Amino acid sequence: MTMTDPVADMLTRLRNANSAYHDTVSMPSSKLKTRVAEILKAEGYIQDWREEEAEVGKKLTIDLKFGPQRERAIAGLRRISKPGLRVYAKSTNLPHVLGGLGIAILSTSSGLLTNQQAAKKGVGGEVLAYVW
């Protein structure tokens, strides 16, 4: 069965594993999900990610990050642009998440970028998700 919104599925799996204090979470892999995982690692929200061979296709495994007393590195995730309602932002009107404490992940003509990277490059795009 095909998945309607793979990014929402990824964010939901991350949110559920994070709230249950799981150390890792696995999901079907794609280029888009891999790029989202790269951004989350670069911004310090996850410890690491890897792509593994599965019975069918590839599997993306993400190692979640916790503090010394098991504090969650990811406080929240929200899918913004959905298949039924796409949300776009111009380069002059990029979103700020929690006053700059969180990140927005955008799909731009330059690939997937955070709101800060998109502002530096002067590009806008589709707002995929907020992470804080």
UniProtKB/Swiss-Prot annotation:
Swiss-Prot/TrEMBL GO biological process terms = translation
Q: Which family does it belong to?
A: Belongs to the universal ribosomal protein uS8 family.
Q: Which Gene3D superfamilies match?
A: 3.30.1370.30, 3.30.1490.10
Which species is the source of this protein? Micrococcus luteus (strain ATCC 4698 / DSM 20030 / JCM 1464 / CCM 169 / CCUG 5858 / IAM 1056 / NBRC 3333 / NCIMB 9278 / NCTC 2665 / VKM Ac-2230) (Micrococcus lysodeikticus)
**Task of the protein:** One of the primary rRNA binding proteins, it binds directly to 16S rRNA central domain where it helps coordinate assembly of the platform of the 30S subunit.
Q: Which gene does this sequence derive from?
A: rpsH
Q: How does it assemble?
A: Part of the 30S ribosomal subunit. Contacts proteins S5 and S12.
Q: Is Transmembrane helix there in the keyword field?
A: no
Its name, as the record gives it, is: Small ribosomal subunit protein uS8
Instruction: Please name the InterPro entries in this protein's record.
Output: Ribosomal_uS8, Ribosomal_uS8_CS, Ribosomal_uS8_sf
Pfam families recorded: Ribosomal_S8
rRNA-binding: present as a keyword of the record?
Answer: yes
Any GO molecular function: structural constituent of ribosome
At the top level of its lineage, which domain of life is listed? Bacteria
Gene Ontology CC annotations of this record? ribonucleoprotein complex; ribosome
Provide this UniProt record's keywords sorted from A to Z.
Ribonucleoprotein, Ribosomal protein, RNA-binding, rRNA-binding
- Classification via PANTHER family: 40S RIBOSOMAL PROTEIN S15A
User: Which NCBIfam families is this protein grouped with?
Assistant: PRK00136.1
